[in-house]
Design a protein with these regions (language model features):
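Generic alpha-helical structural context detector
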Residues: 56, 88-91, 111, 115
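Active-site-proximal alpha-helical segments within enzyme catalytic domains
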Residues: 30-37, 77-99, 151-159
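Catalytic-site signature segments of enzymes, centered on catalytic residues
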Residues: 1-77
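Active-site Gly/Thr loop motif
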Residues: 62-64, 107, 111-158
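Carbohydrate-binding/catalytic loop surfaces
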Residues: 70-81, 131-138
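A beta-strand-loop signature enriched in Asp, Gly, Thr, and Trp
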Residues: 65-76, 96-119
Length: 159
């Protein structure tokens, strides 16, 4: 995908190999397509839009979003935040999308993204681009899976 002349055409041309929802296989193409939809719908790049509606309101501080050779942000794996920024994202989810008395994300959306959609492995589940723990909707994690993976985990039963 990263070396294709048109990453979006490359993604859309991939064959569907199983019944949707029957088997989980991670694919960075879905976040790439979502990033393109956000950019087209808002008229802003994914990094600029996220900065405006999420990062600045939360006071996340510096961020970096790596881009491919085509200039498109690597939506699946290219975001870099400081640890305190990651903690704030976890706190936002624990607070059902509210931050300092302001709604940053709708509470019903937070509930949907922390609800498992499909079992993956080792008692874990996945849904809406989020990895979750073995107990249904009792935990979520923001997981970095690169060489030095980072994970923020929150036990929602303690919220």
């Amino acid at each position: 995908m990263e070396v294709a002349s048109d990453r979006f055409r490359f993604i859309l041309d991939r064959p569907i190999v199983t019944e949707p929802g029957a088997k989980w296989t991670y694919c960075g193409g879905a976040p790439a397509l979502l990033a393109r939809l956000i950019a087209k719908g808002t008229g802003e790049t994914l990094p600029a839009y996220c900065r405006k509606v999420l990062f600045d309101p939360l006071g996340l501080g510096p961020s970096e979003w790596s881009v491919g050779a085509d200039g498109e942000p690597r939506a699946a794996s290219g975001l870099r935040l400081r640890p305190r920024g990651l903690v704030k994202l976890g706190q936002l989810v624990l607070a059902s999308g509210s931050w300092n008395g302001h709604s940053i994300a709708p509470a019903d959306w937070i509930k949907r993204v922390t609800t498992p959609v499909i079992a993956i492995s080792y008692g874990r589940s996945y849904g809406y681009h989020w990895h979750m723990g073995g107990r249904a909707a009792a935990a979520f994690s923001l997981a970095g899976r690169h060489r030095l993976g980072r994970t923020i985990s929150a036990d929602l039963s303690r919220a």
